[in-house]
Design a protein with these regions (language model features):
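Non-heme di-metal
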Residues: 1-167
């Protein structure tokens, strides 16, 4: 599945790179819109498992962590909105349809293979950090983007820790 994760990510990145070449904030907005979906999906599945009596401290810890990650990604999304990232309806249309698909894929993926679901999300967080890093090479004075990049690195590390917790 890790190979499928890499292929999926590479294809998605290629499409987004093509559509958003030279448009930093719309690209960031789309990435942040998408970034929340796995955390919502993970929380949904963890809540379902908990409702079925399949809970434990690890479930509770993961739910808290994923909720915090969702809030943090929402703050990033709001920052990109302030910068005009969601200005055009076509960007909103694309992102919201992609996120709907991505959410349900993550629900199924996390339900049946949480380790690989976390692996895919970790790869996406590292990609987001890399995307922000490239922007910062051009605009090193942008402290807000620098802080967001650090958050993405932290999220990737948290996902790696989540994999460790459930194995």
């Amino acid at each position: 599945m890790k190979t499928l994760n890499k292929i999926t990510l590479d294809v998605t990145i290629s499409i987004i790179d093509f559509l958003y070449r030279g448009r930093h904030f719309p690209r960031f907005w789309v990435l942040e819109e998408i970034a929340r979906a796995p955390y919502f999906a993970f929380i949904s599945v963890l809540h379902l498992r908990e409702s079925l009596g399949l809970r434990g401290q690890v479930h509770t810890d993961l739910m808290k962590e994923h909720f915090a990650q969702t809030l943090n990604e929402t703050e990033h999304l709001e920052e990109m909105e302030k910068r005009g990232g969601n200005k055009y309806w076509i960007d909103r249309f694309f992102a919201r349809h992609l996120v709907l698909l991505y959410y349900w894929i993550n629900v199924a993926y996390y339900l049946f293979d949480p380790i690989d679901a976390y692996d895919l999300s970790e790869k996406i967080e590292w990609h987001a950090a890399d995307t922000y890093s490239k922007y910062l090479e051009e605009f090193p004075q942008d402290e807000k983007i620098s802080a967001i990049m650090q958050d993405e690195i932290h999220h990737a590390q948290e996902l790696s820790e989540a994999i460790r917790l459930i194995t």
